[in-house]
Every structure is written in structure tokens, then in C-alpha cells.
Amino acid sequence: MVNKDNNYTNMQKTSYHNGTGNHPEHNDNEDYWNILLSDLKDSDNWSNKIALDFASGKGRNVSNMLSICNWNRVDGVDISEGNIEFCKTWYNAKLSDWYCNNGVDVSDLKDNEYDFIMSTIALQHIPVYDIRKSLITDLLRTLKPGGLFSFQMGFGEGLESPLGPRSAYYTNFYDANGTNSHHDVRVHNESDVIDDLKNIGFVNITTEVRESYSDSGHTHWIYVKAYKPQ
């Protein structure tokens, strides 16, 4: 278990308290639609099912998912109180529930609730392996058996960046003095992610490395898909 009262999470909560941007420019990323959300193209397969966006920001991904499938519900969870209050007001007519999490797990979410979980431009901002593992382990709990987790992280060589230092995948850098690209984690090889997800309990894990999009902090991104066992 990760202590909720740790330096990194406290810094994140302060940084994100009032909210973030909605990043509409990332809707123009073809890989967003053709890789991250590619499984949703078979829209009939998701009718009356339930999805979640982890680190949902101001609701862009939730709105996008609602627009392409006839879901029962698409929820959002985020560390920012400002973002969640914005979404509760702005999307009050949508088929969505919104949750503000504590930064180290998603304990307010039900077991075996979601058929599909996505996350983008989020996990790469957390240079603390123990926190990412705690979050991903808890997201697995909330997936239904056979459910899919599709996410993206920064990928490339070295730890240098024009935006600030990067940390390696298994590093625990609790004392980062900034988030949201100021001190990201960088995946150096696909096997780190695959092995980690297997150890957490996921199966049928696939990855795809592509050039990054509107992200000067990473030359490439890695897209990952992993399933909860049936």
C-alpha cells in the first residue's frame, strides 16, 4: 500500500487543485483514434456497457467515447477537485459519474464495474513507480473479467528532455518538484511495461510505439492494451 500522504501526491494535488486544460488539440492525433480507441470502432460491441477515463481532466475523452458508442455510462476519475467540479456541471446531462480520487488508488470505484478503461497523457506524468503500480492494480480491480485497459505513456532513449528530467520506469522519485511534463517517467523498452502488467495480473498484453504527438518531452509514445482475465 502507498501512503496517501506522500510528497509526490501532495504536490500533485496542489498543482492540479484548480483544474487543467482539456487538450482539444489531441483529438487531431490519428493514433488516438486508430490505436488507443481502436477497439471502440466496433461500436455494437460496447452497447449498454460501461467505460472509464482515468485522469479524465475536463472530460474530453469521456465526451469522445460517448459520441462513438451507445454506452450505458462513461465515467471519469481525476485527482483534481477543480476538474471534477467542472465536469459535474458541464456534463450534467451526460451518462457519466465523476470521481475525485486520492492520487494513489481509485478506491471509490466499484469492483468489476468497467468493460473498458482508457488513460492518455496521464500515467507518463507520474515518476513514482509505486504510485503507478498502486493505481493500475486498483484499476484492474474495477475492470470486469475480460475487460480492456488501453493507455499511453512516454517512450524513448535516455532521461534528458527540454522540459525537464525524466525518470526510468521502475524509479520512485517522490521528490519531483513539478508534474504535468515537468518531471515525467519514460519507458525505455516495451518489456518493462509488459512484465509489470503481467505481474499485476493482466493478460494478452500488446504494445505499439509511435512518434509522440504535441509532446516535446518525449520523442515517442507507447500505446498499451491489456486485459483482465476472464
Each model region followed by its residue ranges:
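Class I (Rossmann-like) S-adenosyl-L-methionine-dependent methyltransferase catalytic domain
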Residues: 1-46, 57-106, 129-130, 149-230
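A short, conserved alpha-helix within the catalytic core of class I
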Residues: 126-138
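Short glycine-dipeptide loop
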Residues: 143-149
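Conserved beta-strand/loop positions that form the S-adenosyl-L-methionine
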Residues: 54
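A short acidic, Gly/Pro-enriched loop at the edge of an enzyme's catalytic core
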Residues: 108-117
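Class I S-adenosylmethionine-dependent transferase superfamily signal
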Residues: 65, 138-139
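A short beta-strand submotif of the Rossmann-like class I SAM-dependent methyltransferase core
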Residues: 119-122
